[in-house]
Regions:
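An acidic/histidine-cluster motif and surrounding catalytic segment
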Residues: 1-101, 109-117
Length: 117
């Protein structure tokens, strides 16, 4: 089950059902199943606080993923900075929604076991 939350901002995801199906398809393509996925939309300042508190990283980022997976069941928290998504979309010349989807899948791929390198 994918659930969406807002931390210090208000953001409403368009087409939640379509997004959920897409995430399920990505997980299935890697022989994984969605368990409990919490996607938390927040600001740059909030994600910086999370980065400092839990990872001891003093920099902004677009996503932080906390992995609680059990074997082939994906469970985790994905903190996503809406501010960074807006900046990334502008920088890369893409639509906000496309960049948001890219970052959500990026987080899901971390839960599957991929890293940034």
């Amino acid at each position: 089950m994918v659930r969406y939350f807002n931390e210090d901002i208000k953001y409403v995801l368009k087409q939640k059902l379509l997004n959920n199906r897409w995430l399920k398809t990505v997980a299935g393509s890697e022989m994984k199943k969605l368990g409990n996925i919490n996607i938390i939309f927040c600001s740059d300042n909030y994600i910086l606080e999370v980065n400092l508190k839990y990872l001891q990283h003093d920099y902004f980022t677009d996503i932080i993923t906390f992995d609680y997976c059990e074997k082939d069941i994906l469970n985790g928290d994905l903190f996503i900075s809406i501010d960074s998504i807006k900046d990334n979309a502008e920088h890369y010349g893409t639509e906000f929604e496309n960049e948001l989807c890219r970052v959500m899948v990026h987080g899901l791929l971390h839960l599957i076991g991929y890293d940034d390198h």
